[in-house]
Amino acid sequence: MAQDATQIQFTEYNFKYNFEDVGFLRMGVTAAELGFRYVQVNDAAQTTGIIAISKNGVAPTLRVEMLQTQYETIFGNIAGDQVYPIVDGAKIAYGIGDRKVSLFELAKPGILHPVGVDDDDYANDIYFHLVVPDLSSVSYGGNRDNAQTVTMNFFVLRDSTKSADFNYGIFGDWTATTNA
């Protein structure tokens, strides 16, 4: 991925996993610090969480903290019946199944798109070729009186079918980029 952080001009991004909106991010001073907030949780509350890009070995890691939410796409599409929230007040019930999945099969594009920019204007996007959730990292927090939290890591994988310069992702118009 291009390392020139000066290309990052916006402070708020929509976060898309497999081209689906899942929330929005607040950018810090560097590309390594991103804040994350779900737009919708339930009718009674709006809560916040954290997402950060950090190095984990040779691959960057997206660490995502998601607060109690009614978004079924995150858990339904990613984990099937393995992990699922049931919203009841401030509580989340969850279940772990024995279904096995390959994280590489779940790897999808991840996109940071600036808030307030037209959906078809990709000039300032931050595009990751392959983003995958680490289901083994799912943890739960909170108590009866506070919002429950679900924390899960997302890994950014290298895509060897892309050019050597852009094998993690690119800044800018990713729709105009071809494989080298």
Task: Label every PLM stretch briefly.
Residues 1-78, 130-149:
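Solvent-exposed edge beta-strands and adjacent loop segments
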Residues 1-9, 96-107:
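Short linear motifs in intrinsically disordered
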Residues 28-36, 78-83, 94-97, 117-125:
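A generic short-segment signal for beta-strand/edge and adjacent turn/coil regions
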Residues 43-50, 91-99, 178-180:
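Surface-exposed ligand/attachment interfaces on beta-rich extracellular proteins
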Residues 61-65, 111-113, 151-155:
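Beta-strand secondary-structure signal
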Residues 69-101:
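Charged, amphipathic alpha-helical segments
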Residues 98-141:
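Acidic, glycine-rich flexible loop segments
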Residues 124-180:
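Mixed-charge, glycine-accented linear interaction segment located at domain edges/termini
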